[in-house]
Each structure stands twice: as structure tokens, then as C-alpha cells.
């Protein structure tokens, strides 16, 4: 008989007081200890264990949204089965219903990785060991890769269980072979495998049934919650699925294009550019203050640039502000001679009030001045 090798028994670390005391953050090697607890709980199985026992087992070690995946290869090709939290209890129960009396997992050189909210355990040399008592005492060793994801909290429950089976072996004690060495029929029966790829017919049939049961979990849950008929549950689920399919995908928020500020030409600059010729032609008739009127109509002030890190576009340009002087307009009162002459500051005898003599009067005065000479 082969010796059973379950590996070294995990020791309680100093920080662990006793089972049942909650802790907010798990200690080191907590994943190994959870596998040890799972094996210990499976060893407590008896034939009297009912559905409530298996549901309590699953609640203790699996999350509410846990997914269990089994992959293996049969004669007709590779198989992959994925079941949810509701069907996980029946999966472990089917192993014992298939004739197994004991179940445990042996992990060699597992690799533990910490992530944001979960801890992953990857073991490339995992062995699932089951012992069968019928029709003959047989130990089945299923070798494969086991990948687990534990939630990083005080409960450390499994969220993802993925077991990829590579090969299996069925071991029989030598004593049994010696007892039936003279019986050819018994030796022929002992030479046949009792499992397929390490799984019993009960487990394989249940996994095939899960292909139908897993999609129906939504219907069953809706039936229990709303007490609808199966036909109404199916119509509601199909309608919601159709809505999810035809609903347009949410467009990502588009960033508004940056609008560049257009610099508008001010009235003073327009006058200075468009009326430049007029200013040159009438420079003899107007006072020099008229040029000051064009340049002092408005004041262009350049603001400070924004700080580093601002958005490109509006904010990174210098802000140009137009300040209008409404109290003083140099153009008023320069070209209008009537308003200038009617000023109250000018008296009746003011020299500024006298008009220059006309050309005819100057001609009439010239002959008299020559005659007097």
C-alpha cells in the first residue's frame, strides 16, 4: 500500500491566536492554511452529510460570486466546465457519490502573489487524491495545475478555482493483487480503470448537466425572487438580454475642443490704419493734437500668462484687454469749430474770437497802403 503523503502540516504562526477570532488583514502563508482547513473539513465528511452540510462547506471556503472551472481531455477531445457558486456544493458531493470515501489536495511548491484585492495561489504540481472502497480499494491520484484566487480580507474565501488535469493514476495495494493472483477474471477486472481522467461517472454526468443548469441559474433565481412562472421568467430574461445587446455602447466623454480667442481689431486701430491717408492730407488744416486723438482712443493691456500646467488653447495665451477712456475723447472738440468758438472761456474781445481776414479785404487794404507811401 502506498503511503499517503499530505506534506508538512502548517504550523500556527505566533500572530494567530485561535480559530474563530476575526482579523482584518491575513497573515503570511494564509493561503496554505486555507487549503489545510479545506482538507480537514473534507475529512469530516460522513454519509449522513446532507445538502445543508455541503452548502455550509461552500459558504466557508467560496465567495458568493465564485467560479469553479475544471479542464481535462477525454477520448473525444478536451473538455472545459465552469460552474457558479450555486452548483459548487453539488460538485464536491458528486465526488463522494461516485464511490470516494476520502478527498484531499496536495500542493507542492505553490507560488503566492499579492494583488490589489486578492491573493493568487498558483501550483503547477497539484495532486487531487481520492480513495475508493468499491469495487476494490483504490487510490486515485489526479495530477494537474491548480490556480486559486483568494479575497484579501479576514475571511480569505476563494473567488476563482481553476484545476487543469494533465494525467491520473489508479493505485492498488500489492496485497490485493497477491490474493487474486490465481483468478484471471479478477485480475482482468482489477486492470480496468474505475475513473475517466481521474473523475468518476457521477462527477462527469453532473458536469455535463451543469452545461444546462448553469445558464438556467438566472431563471431559477428570478422564479424564487418574483414568484413568476417559468415562461414569464424566460421572457423577462430574454428581453433584458436583448436590451443589453441592442443598447448602444456608452460613448466616452469627448473633450471639448479648445477654442482659440480671436483678436478683434479695435476701433482706434481701424481708424489709424484706414484713415492714415486722410491724416496725412489734412495735416496742414488740423492741429497736431489730432494725431494724439487717434492713438489715445483705447489702450491695449497684455495680461500675465497662466501658470505652468494649464490647458493649451484659451488659457495659455496672453489675455488682451481693451480699456476705453469714456471721460476724455481727444477727437471731440478739435474738428468742430463751432463748439470751440462757443466756449464760455472765450470773451467778446478775446483775440482767439477774431476771424482771420479774407482775401478780398487784404487786397483792398494793399492799395491804400501804397498810396500813403
From Swiss-Prot:
Annotated region (Disordered), positions in chain: 248-297, 329-373
Predominant cellular place of this UniProt entry's protein = nucleus
Output compositional bias ranges, type Low complexity.
Answer: 266-282
Biased composition range(s): Polar residues: 288-297
PTM entry text: Undergoes rnf12-mediated ubiquitin-proteasome-dependent degradation.
Gene3D superfamilies per the record? Answer: Cysteine Rich Protein
Q: Name one GO biological process term.
A: positive regulation of transcription by RNA polymerase II
Indicate whether Nucleus appears among the record's keywords: yes
* Domain comment as written in the entry: The dimerization domain is located in the N-terminus.
Q: How does it associate, per the subunit comment?
A: Forms homodimers and heterodimers. Interacts with and activates lhx1/lim1. The stoichiometry of lhx1/lim1 and ldb1 is important for their function and an excess of ldb1 can inhibit lhx1/lim1 function. When bound to lhx1/lim1, escapes degradation by rnf12. Interacts with the N-terminal region of rnf12.
Please explain the role this protein plays, according to its UniProt record: Binds to the LIM domain of a wide variety of LIM domain-containing transcription factors. Acts as a coactivator together with otx2 to stimulate lhx1/lim1-mediated activation of the gsc promoter in the Spemann organizer. Acts synergistically with lhx1/lim1 and ssbp in axis formation.
> Hey, which family's this protein in?
Belongs to the LDB family.
> What is the official name of this protein in its record?
LIM domain-binding protein 1
| Species, as recorded | Xenopus tropicalis (Western clawed frog)
Amino acid at each position: 500500500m502506498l503511503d499517503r503523503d499530505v506534506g508538512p502540516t502548517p504550523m500556527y504562526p505566533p500572530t494567530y491566536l485561535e480559530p474563530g477570532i476575526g482579523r482584518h488583514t491575513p497573515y503570511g502563508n494564509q493561503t496554505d492554511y486555507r487549503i489545510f482547513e479545506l482538507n480537514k473539513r473534507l475529512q469530516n465528511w460522513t454519509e449522513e452529510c446532507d445538502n445543508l452540510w455541503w452548502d455550509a462547506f461552500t459558504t466557508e471556503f467560496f465567495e458568493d460570486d465564485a467560479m469553479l472551472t475544471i479542464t481535462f481531455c477525454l477520448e473525444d477531445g478536451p473538455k472545459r466546465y465552469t460552474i457558479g457558486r450555486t452548483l459548487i456544493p453539488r460538485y464536491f458531493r458528486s465526488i463522494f457519490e461516485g464511490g470516494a470515501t476520502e478527498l484531499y489536495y496536495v500542493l507542492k511548491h505553490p507560488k503566492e502573489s499579492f494583488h490589489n484585492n486578492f491573493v493568487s495561489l498558483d501550483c503547477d504540481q497539484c495532486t487531487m487524491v481520492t480513495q475508493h472502497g468499491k469495487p476494490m480499494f483504490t487510490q486515485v491520484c489526479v495530477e494537474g495545475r491548480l490556480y486559486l484566487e483568494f479575497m484579501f480580507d479576514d475571511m480569505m474565501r476563494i473567488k476563482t478555482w481553476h484545476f487543469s488535469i494533465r494525467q491520473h493514476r489508479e493505485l492498488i495495494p500489492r496485497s490485493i493483487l497477491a490474493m487474486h493472483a490465481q483468478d484471471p477474471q479478477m485480475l482482468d477486472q482489477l486492470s480496468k480503470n474505475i475513473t475517466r481522467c481521474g473523475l468518476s461517472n457521477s462527477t462527469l454526468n453532473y458536469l455535463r448537466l451543469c452545461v444546462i443548469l448553469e445558464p438556467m441559474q438566472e431563471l431559477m433565481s428570478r422564479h424564487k425572487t418574483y414568484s413568476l412562472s417559468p415562461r414569464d421568467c424566460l421572457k423577462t430574461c430574454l428581453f433584458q438580454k436583448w436590451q443589453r445587446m441592442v443598447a448602444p455602447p456608452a460613448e466616452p466623454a469627448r473633450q471639448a475642443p479648445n477654442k482659440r480667442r480671436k483678436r478683434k481689431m479695435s476701433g482706434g486701430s481701424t481708424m489709424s490704419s484706414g484713415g492714415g491717408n486722410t491724416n496725412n492730407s489734412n495735416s496742414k488744416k488740423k492741429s497736431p493734437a489730432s494725431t494724439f486723438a487717434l492713438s489715445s482712443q483705447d489702450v491695449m493691456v497684455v495680461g500675465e500668462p497662466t501658470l505652468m500646467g494649464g490647458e493649451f488653447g484659451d488659457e495659455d495665451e496672453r489675455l488682451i484687454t481693451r480699456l476705453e477712456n469714456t471721460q476724455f475723447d481727444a477727437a471731440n472738440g478739435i474738428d468742430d469749430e463751432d463748439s470751440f468758438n462757443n466756449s464760455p472761456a472765450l470773451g467778446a474781445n478775446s483775440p482767439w474770437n477774431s476771424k482771420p481776414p479774407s482775401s478780398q479785404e487784404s487786397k483792398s487794404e494793399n492799395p491804400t497802403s501804397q498810396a500813403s507811401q
